[in-house]
From Swiss-Prot:
Name listed for the protein in its UniProt record: 1-(5-phosphoribosyl)-5-[(5-phosphoribosylamino)methylideneamino] imidazole-4-carboxamide isomerase
Family: Belongs to the HisA/HisF family.
Catalytic EC class: isomerase
EC number: 5.3.1.16
Length: 239
């Protein structure tokens, strides 16, 4: 999935605009403009993968930024992974046929673990399971409902179901530029043999190095890039 450690820019979409949330909570968003412009900016800066999230889909359960997603796919030629509102095999089929390379399942995987294997059987290697952790437990439905699941145990479970990778988001530090908690990532990495993508809290180049040292295969970075804490080129240089 990732031949070497990769820094992946986030393009989180709400109401057709790029936003970043603080702690995964609605109403805390800062807007950063047009998704296509943002995506092109990161591709021009050297991004090999884009991380797209339909936040309306994550919160409401139905994808609401399809036009923006399609526009990004048409405007760029890099790998794209997409999450938010993917609830069925048909949803995944549609996105993968549209040109998305990997679909990210969160709520759907918790509610119906079999969906991971069903999609993987049809599209091998295309499923990443999103484990969003808040107060040490996996949360779903736009980070509003706790499942009681331990992230490391859940990661191992979804690997057995056929997941090709895990996206671990530390919601407690998401969007806050407060630094990463590499020990939380290391717990998940140690539980599985598939790639683990780390997300949440990256604020410095040292954070990126810490995630790499913890065993993550890649990290998704949003607010730090949009706020100019460092450039994508600088991030690539340290890994």
């Amino acid at each position: 999935m990732f031949p070497s450690f990769e820094v992946i820019p986030a393009v989180d979409m709400q109401d057709g605009q790029v936003v970043q949330l603080v702690g995964g909570e609605r109403g805390t968003e800062t807007e950063y403009g047009d998704p296509v412009a943002a995506a092109q900016r990161w591709v021009d800066a050297g991004a090999e993968t884009l991380h797209l999230v339909d936040l309306d889909g994550a919160f409401e359960g139905e994808r609401a930024n399809a036009d923006a997603v399609e526009a990004v796919l048409e405007a760029t030629d890099v790998s794209v992974q997409l999450g938010g509102g993917i609830r069925t095999v048909d949803d995944a089929d549609s996105l993968l046929s549209m040109g998305v390379d990997r679909v990210i399942l969160g709520t759907a995987a918790v509610e119906n673990p079999d969906i991971v294997g069903e999609i993987n059987d049809r599209h091998p290697g295309s499923v990443v399971v999103s484990l969003d952790a808040k107060d040490g437990e996996v949360v779903v439905s736009g980070w509003t409902e706790s499942t009681g699941l331990d992230p490391a145990e859940a990661a191992a479970r979804y690997e057995a179901e056929g997941a090709g990778g895990v996206l671990f988001t530390d919601v407690d530090v998401e969007g806050q530029l407060s630094g990463v908690r590499a020990d939380e990532i290391a717990r998940v990495v140690d539980a599985v043999d598939i790639p683990v993508i780390a997300s949440g809290g990256v604020s410095t180049l040292s954070d990126i190095e810490a995630l790499k040292d913890a065993g993550a295969a890649a990290t998704v970075v949003g607010t730090a890039l949009y706020e100019g804490e460092f450039t994508l080129e600088e991030a690539a240089a340290v890994v």
